[in-house]
Amino acid sequence: MFIAHRGLYDDNIKENTIEAFDNAFNNGYQGIEFDIRLTKDKIPVVLHDSFLSRVFGIKGLLKDFTYQELLDKKDIHIPKLEDVINRYQNKVMIIELKEKIDITKYLENPKNDYYISSFNYDYVSCLKKSINYKLGVINYVLNSAVDYSKLNFIMILDTIYNQKLFKFKELEIVIYGVVGKINDYNKELKYIV
């Protein structure tokens, strides 16, 4: 299975947008990975950075804008989490929490395959385990401060792993990056991996 990191984007299609996600699915990807942050009015939206300048060329932090203020700006197309989930039924979604947000009310459709992840263990450990989604952390190595019994999977970044190491924890292993199944490169690379 191939997962498009922030969708399939290029110079003409911005990352973490509906266009990037549509492009990924139209090019054979089975799932998408995207990042969640909150606006000033606490709307969960899809955006990797806390600031708007890199992707949209606009000064300011996401947390300083309401969702309506973002909609009013030209050339900013930041989707709400709810819209992404409703649009891509029956698709794999790896949802990375960039801050502490309880998104579980959006994940009630068991038809979707949701993986909620974060580099910050505290962001996912406060969420309850459910049959509707899987909880995990993103890491470079195993971390003794993490209670793996509260998780369903671990994502290992660009590292060599040993399946026996994870088998005793009964965790699903998701390998992240070029050596694995999630990538943010062009569609040709998808076939090389």
For the regions a language model picked out, list residue spans one by one.
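Phosphate-group recognition and catalysis centered on beta-loop-alpha active-site segments
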Residues: M1-V193
